[in-house]
Structures are given as C-alpha cells and as structure tokens.
A protein has these predicted regions:
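C-terminal functional module detector
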Residues: 3-14, 22-29, 34-248
Length: 248
C-alpha cells in the first residue's frame, strides 16, 4: 500500500516543493502518471493499493501549511463499522481516495459471464466464451459543502486499463506501457439514480489478464498538471483502486 495524496497540504508551495518530483493534482507522481510506477506494480500482478495521507503538524490557520486530518484528503473503505472489517477492507483494496470531498461514494464493478468483482477483487472469464467485460461506475457527490465552503462538481471520469504481464525482468522498471485511458466520460455520459450517478461501459474482447481503475476530476485537464501556487481546492481528483480481470 502506498500513499496517493501526500499529506493534503494547505499551501501548494508545499505540494509542489519536491524539487524534480512535484505532485500532480495533489497526488504523487507514482499515482498520478498513467503508465507510471503504480501501473508498473499492478502490471506485475501486485495487489498494491493507494490510500490518502491526512497527517497534520501545524494547521494553516496557525501559521503552518497543513489541513486537519480528513479536512482535504480522505480515504474511504468499503466496510462495516467494525475494526476488523475496516482493516480487512484496507488489506484487500476496497478503497477509494478523494480530495476536497469531490465525491463521498465510489463503486466500480466489472462483470462478465455471470461473474462480478469490485475494487480489490478479481473476475475470471473464460476464453471459450465471449470475453466482453461490462464496467459500471457509480459515484455520489457530497450532500453539502466541503471544508472550503464549496460544492465541487465532477467534470470528467476516466476509465484506465492496463495489462497484467507478470514480474518484470528489469527490477528498476517503473512504467507499464500497456496502460492507457480507454474512455473518458462527461456529464452527458452519466445518468442520475437517486443521489448517485451511473456510468456504464463495455470492454470488448478482453483477451489477456488485465486490470481496470477509475479516476475523476473537477478540472478540464486531460491529465493532472504539476502543482504550482494555485488553490488546492480548485484542483480536485479521486481515484479508485483496481479491479483485476483474469482470462483463462
């Protein structure tokens, strides 16, 4: 497990302070770069989950540069409100992360041949049948305002897919060239069901072991940009953890 947003800094001077390795949209490069380190680990078949860090040393209102825990970045775990189930959800990737309360619920489900799997899980499909995989994305915006007094809106959701090819011979490899954004969705592509929004997409003829993951943003950026001095509240993103597809 590794962090996504590194601490949720209240001042973007700190968010972008990492020299040659700035954060992108509030997240470290390992998470934010499509085909980067996180995707390289997933491509090796590793169950490597991301979480958000929300530690706080000195709050920005007291001269520091931090938010309070959970004020800006949050980790959500799909679990019952029981200690052991929360820890089980963390261990097994039933997690999504968000900044600025862009969303308060995210469910990603892959289904095919009568089987289904969610974040952190694996769906197995047979080559003997048609290997289309149906993806359903459900997200819920906040009912009220976030800690900045805003009502953020999701402007785009991306579906990202990569191949699982097994351990790399190059132990320094930090890329997965098979990973790509395969579909982008805007407000015209989702429909409302109660308090949630639903997106459906079909991956045709998935012929090899793969994984899929989802991200979304409040911006119109095609990819997260390196953080500068802008307000972190104007550059919000969420990420799911992956669903794996095994082809047999």
């Amino acid at each position: 497990m590794r962090p996504g947003p590194p601490g949720g800094p209240a001042q973007r001077q700190r968010a972008g302070r990492y020299g040659n390795h700035p954060t992108y949209g509030g997240y470290d490069q390992a998470t934010a770069r499509v085909g980067g380190l996180w995707d390289a680990l997933l491509g090796e078949g590793r169950r490597w989950w991301i979480t958000a860090i929300s530690d706080s040393h000195v709050h920005w209102t007291r001269g520091g540069s931090d938010f309070r825990p959970g004020e800006y970045s949050k980790t959500y775990v799909l679990a019952r409100q029981e200690y052991h189930d929360i820890m089980d959800g963390l261990r097994h990737g039933r997690i999504f992360v968000t900044t600025g309360d862009l969303i308060t619920r995210l469910d990603v489900t892959a289904s095919g041949q009568g089987r289904a799997a969610g974040a952190g899980e694996t769906i197995t499909v047979s080559r003997r049948d048609r290997t289309d995989v149906d993806v359903e994305i459900r997200f819920r915006p906040p009912a009220g305002t976030n800690a900045n007094g805003d009502r953020p809106q999701v402007r785009r959701v991306d579906l990202i897919v990569g191949r699982v090819t097994g351990p790399s011979a190059d132990r320094d490899a930090d890329t997965n060239p098979t990973t790509a954004v395969v579909a982008r969705f805007g407000p015209r592509d989702w429909r409302q069901q109660g308090a949630q929004y639903v997106i459906r997409h079909t991956l045709r003829d998935v012929g090899a072991d793969s994984y899929l993951r989802v991200r979304g943003t409040s911006t119109d950026e095609a990819e997260p940009l390196a953080d500068g001095l802008e307000s972190p509240w104007s550059d919000l993103w969420f990420y799911s953890n992956p669903v794996f597809v095994r082809v047999r």
